[in-house]
Amino acid sequence: MTAAATAEAELLDLSRQLLAAVAAGDWAAYRRLVADDLTCFEPEAKGQLVEGLAFHEFYFRLPGDPAKPARPVTNTLASPVVKFFSDTVALVAYVRLTQTLDDAGRPVTKPCEETRLWQKVGGTWKHVHFHRSLPS
């Protein structure tokens, strides 16, 4: 495997780890993967550029309903593309397909378009920016 292919595989794996941390509500894993000064545009931000981690931490800290069992969640990166801008900056773009159960217990799949920027800092890739859009 070439160095570029290895780096591409690593970034796709890190992106999957990031989505798994979000799905599991694992703040510690999320923090290991993202930069302190993460920026983003996402539907929850209502068109505003969010900077830092406090906005995201709010969602991780929300209590679950103990009366309801956790729903299974599977995230698939459909048609992922990795583009390197340098040895230390890369873009990962894909459609995320999130499979779960609705309130009636039926399987549902929800798509969203995501673009994520990663920067290698001190030899470690950190997630530094993302843009997530719901299909119109």
Predicted regions mapped to residue ranges:
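Basic/polar N-terminal segments that are highly enriched at the extreme N-terminus
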Residues: 1-9, 136
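Short beta-strand segments enriched in hydrophobic/aromatic residues
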Residues: 34-35, 96-98, 131-134
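Short, cysteine-centered beta-strand-loop-beta hairpins and adjacent loop/turn segments enriched
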Residues: 99-108
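Short beta-strand edge/turn micro-motifs at domain boundaries
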Residues: 109-136
